[in-house]
Amino acid sequence: MIYAGILAGGIGSRMGNVPLPKQFLLLQGKPIIIHTVEKFLMYKDFDEIIIATPQKWINYMHDLLNNYRLDDKKIKVIQGGDDRNHTIMNIIESIEQHKKLNDEDIIVTHDAVRPFLTNRIIRENVEYASQYGAVDTVVNAVDTIISSNDAQFISEIPIRSEMYQGQTPQTFKIKELKDSYLSLTQSQKEILTDACKILVELGKPVKLVKGELFNIKITTPYDLKVANSIITGAVDND
């Protein structure tokens, strides 16, 4: 089975003085997270779409889904965790409460504040996760990447053609991700905050899927301005 996990656990501190968490801010008159949910509903192979949000915003999320007539039976809203990976584990636990997982079950995890993902990106994530077990969505690094050990001087300038910027979705065979996460020590869990990095550190393959430059993450007021420019430009979603 194929599951979607929409990660909406953040409060958006980098967005500044705003009345709502960033995922609920309006983008062309509609909450960002609603744009994202609509994109997931366009991909018809999902058996369940699980939205993980702070507990105090669960009822608000339900109200939004009702207001925008997205009260689809396959959508479920649960409480997120203390961090990204904890939120993903909460989603997996929610699935396990009513389904027995098998080795081929897949979860597509995605930032709620990336509303411009495409069907192609989702489709390739699912296809490659079925084949390789784990997938990360990336775009080529446009700028030269600088590494500094002390934030004062350059330590290294990696070869740009080998550098990529990570996006989401990140997609996994569920049992493999869960088993990998549970194998970590508490200190490792605190350091390895990216799910793909857990698998990489354990020596497991993570396949790359080409993202899109417009698949941006909306975390600052500037990002929101860029997102409004993208959406008014009628960027195609294939």
From Swiss-Prot:
The record marks 14, 22 as: Transition state stabilizer. CTP binds at residues 7-10, 81-87. It catalyses: D-ribitol 5-phosphate + CTP + H(+) = CDP-L-ribitol + diphosphate. Keywords: Cell wall biogenesis/degradation, Nucleotidyltransferase, Teichoic acid biosynthesis, Transferase. The record marks 160, 217 as: Positions ribitol 5-phosphate for the nucleophilic attack. One of its GO terms (biological process) is cell wall organization. One of its GO terms (molecular function) is 2-C-methyl-D-erythritol 4-phosphate cytidylyltransferase activity. Belongs to the IspD/TarI cytidylyltransferase family. TarI subfamily. This is Ribitol-5-phosphate cytidylyltransferase. It comes from Staphylococcus epidermidis (strain ATCC 35984 / DSM 28319 / BCRC 17069 / CCUG 31568 / BM 3577 / RP62A).
